[in-house]
């Protein structure tokens, strides 16, 4: 009798334990991919994140390499042309600038052309960054050595997709940024400079 009572007590204990364990497992909050948050400097979506919106789930990445290789340079193109839709400076205008450049003069071998034809890790929706997008790359990734093990830049000017707004010079000049020093400068559209491609996620 005592042995049966002992077995019954063990059985009840096991049932109670399994029930409690099941309830505990059901209450665990398993995050989905949509809940994932990203950080600046993280490798993701074919490049390295340099900008995040307030949700920390969407932003911009820059290519991990100079387009075309370390020594390759490109002209802005469209020399002698005024492209008013390519004067966007702010974050988020790089793609619009790039599309405007290619619509006005679809020249092969230009910075914009090279960016939209770049592909990495299956991603092919790249564009030439705007002035402020380039400045953010400098500020968030290139200023110090914090992310040097993830991405590196040359001490050189990198072309933006932003044409000068100055009425006198807009047909011949575009903005570029030295990513190591962080300062912007204007240069002839025909001058060949290094480029990095950017994409949104």
Show which residues each predicted segment covers.
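General helical structural elements
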Residues: 6-8, 99, 200
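Bacterial N-terminal signal peptides
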Residues: 9-16
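C-terminal, surface-exposed recognition/capping segments
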Residues: 32, 108, 124, 131-201
């Amino acid at each position: 009798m005592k042995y049966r009572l002992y077995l019954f007590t063990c059985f009840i204990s096991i049932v109670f334990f399994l029930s409690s364990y099941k309830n505990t497992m059901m209450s665990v909050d398993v995050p989905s991919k949509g809940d994932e948050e990203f950080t600046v400097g993280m490798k993701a979506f074919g490049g390295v994140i340099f900008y995040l919106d307030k949700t920390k789930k969407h932003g911009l990445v820059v290519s991990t390499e100079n387009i075309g290789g370390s020594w390759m340079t490109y002209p802005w193109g469209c020399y002698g042309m005024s492209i008013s839709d390519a004067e966007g400076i702010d974050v988020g205008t790089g793609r619009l600038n790039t599309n405007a450049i290619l619509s006005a003069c679809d020249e092969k071998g230009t910075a914009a052309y090279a960016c939209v034809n770049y592909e990495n890790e299956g991603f092919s929706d790249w564009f030439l960054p705007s002035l402020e997008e380039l400045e953010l790359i400098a500020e968030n990734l290139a200023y110090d050595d914090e992310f040097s093990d993830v991405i590196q830049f040359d001490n050189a000017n990198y072309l933006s997709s932003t044409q000068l707004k100055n009425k006198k010079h807009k047909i011949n000049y575009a903005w570029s940024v030295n990513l190591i020093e962080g300062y912007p400068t204007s240069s002839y559209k025909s001058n060949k400079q290094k480029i990095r491609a950017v994409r949104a996620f």
